[in-house]
């Protein structure tokens, strides 16, 4: 969600999991070659939407990428789905800017970039983030691991700064 000043954050749960037997929360893929194509596809899908709305393309930022990767991994390992202390995370990863935002998503199996962006566009708070012209940088993480009672789930963190 979008944050200014004190960086107040609220969570919007995008996907709801159906109860299932508990499984290990250890991520199957945290980073590297396995998640790089998913990350690239997600950024491309977000930028396609921004282009269609005559907005500037988001540029990948290493600090935002590290923050997103850290948060997705933490949610997988500790089995929670929330923005957490977003302001502290931006500070910890030396993310600079006037405006910050974050979209989260998770789903069973491997989530496609287009499906993720379609869900965000259907949610007014997430749509606002995607179409915010003041946001200029992005970092994403799309690890796959046990989550929400499923042996295989994708947990998406997209962090933005302007």
Task: Show which residues each predicted segment covers.
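Short, surface-exposed glycine/acidic/tryptophan-bearing loops
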Residues: 66-111
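Bacterial N-terminal signal peptides
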Residues: 8-18
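A short alpha-helix/helix-coil micro-patch that ends at or immediately precedes a cysteine
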Residues: 26-77
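Surface-exposed patches in mature extracellular/periplasmic domains of secreted proteins
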Residues: 52-66, 79-90, 127-141
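Disulfide-stabilized extracellular recognition modules
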Residues: 24-26, 110-162
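Positively charged n-region of N-terminal signal peptides that target proteins for export
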Residues: 1-4
């Amino acid at each position: 969600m979008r944050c200014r000043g004190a960086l107040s954050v609220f969570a919007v749960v995008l996907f709801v999991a159906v109860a299932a037997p508990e499984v290990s929360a250890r991520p199957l893929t945290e980073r590297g070659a396995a998640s790089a194509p998913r990350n690239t596809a997600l950024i491309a899908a977000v930028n396609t939407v921004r282009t269609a709305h005559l907005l500037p393309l988001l540029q990948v930022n290493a600090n935002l990428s590290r923050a997103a990767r850290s948060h997705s991994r933490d949610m997988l390992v500790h089995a929670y789905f929330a923005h957490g202390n977003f302001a502290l995370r931006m500070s910890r990863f030396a993310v600079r800017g006037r405006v910050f935002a974050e979209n989260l998503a998770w789903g069973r199996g491997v989530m496609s970039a287009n499906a993720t962006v379609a869900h965000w566009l259907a949610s007014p708070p997430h749509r606002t983030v995607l179409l915010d012209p003041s946001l200029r940088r992005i970092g994403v993480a799309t690890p796959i691991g046990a989550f929400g009672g499923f042996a295989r789930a994708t947990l998406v963190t997209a962090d933005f700064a302007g």
